[in-house]
Each structure stands twice: as structure tokens, then as C-alpha cells.
UniProtKB/Swiss-Prot annotation:
Signal peptide residues on this chain, from the entry's feature table: 1-21
GO biological process: ERAD pathway
Role noted for this protein: Probable component of the endoplasmic reticulum-associated degradation (ERAD) pathway.
Encoding gene, per UniProt annotation: LCL2
Protein name: Long chronological lifespan protein 2
CDD domains assigned to the protein according to its UniProt record, in alphabetical order: LCL2-like (cd23996)
Organism of provenance: Ajellomyces capsulatus (strain NAm1 / WU24) (Darling's disease fungus)
Family (UniProt): Belongs to the LCL2 family.
Length: 122
């Protein structure tokens, strides 16, 4: 009787230990629980419009300060694109400019689409 009880107890202990290890494996595999989420949040830049406003207010520019890049230029349509590696800039005839994603277009295709859109054909 004692031998049967010991066998049952040992079986339950092994079952609980195996289940616990399995849950720890899944916890590590899917983000490590709360600690992992906490770490990833610390790496993100907070949404803080006050930071942008302070940086904008402290920027020194005697001409025009571009709001998107904080570049100091002579006139607004000379503002550079925020992401020049992936955007093309198009100066429009009315003194404004737009930045358009290069998005895999062949050379000149983005400019053609901008012109078609300006004419109302796109």
C-alpha cells in the first residue's frame, strides 16, 4: 500500500514538474512575460509633443525653419524631405513642395504620377 502511494505521489510530482517546465518554455518563447514587455517599452521613443516643441523653439534660424526636418532654408519649398533615402521631393509651381515615397517606382515614374494628379487625371 505504501509502495502504491509512493508511486502515485512520485508520478504526480513528475507530472507537475514537467508541466511547469513546459509553461516556462512557452513563456520564454512568446516574450518572457511582463519583464520582456517592460524592456521593449523602455526602448520605444515616447510620444512627446513637448520635446518637439522645445526643440523647435530652441532652433536658431534667421530665414524659414522647416517644421518637418527643422532645417533652416531660404524659402519653404526648399525644405528637404524627412526621409531622403526613400522619398523624392517635387517642387510645385505655387511655391510649395511635396515629398513622395520612391516606393519601387522606376526612375521618373513618381514625377509622372505627381503631374497627372496635379492635372486631375489620376
Amino acid at each position: 500500500m505504501v509502495r502504491i502511494f509512493t508511486s502515485i505521489l512520485l508520478g504526480l510530482l513528475l507530472l507537475v514538474t514537467g508541466t511547469r517546465s513546459q509553461f516556462q518554455f512557452f513563456e520564454q518563447m512568446f516574450g518572457g512575460g511582463q519583464q520582456q514587455q517592460h524592456d521593449s517599452r523602455e526602448q520605444n521613443v515616447p510620444s512627446d509633443s513637448d520635446w518637439y516643441q522645445r526643440t523647435y523653439d530652441n532652433a536658431r534660424c534667421s530665414n524659414y525653419l522647416c517644421p518637418g526636418t527643422l532645417a533652416c532654408v531660404a524659402v519653404p519649398h526648399h525644405c528637404p524631405c524627412q526621409h531622403p533615402a526613400v522619398e523624392d521631393k517635387f517642387e510645385l509651381g505655387d511655391g510649395s513642395a511635396i515629398c513622395v515615397s520612391k516606393g519601387g517606382f522606376k526612375f521618373g515614374e513618381a514625377a509622372r504620377k505627381v503631374e497627372l494628379a496635379r492635372k486631375g487625371l489620376l
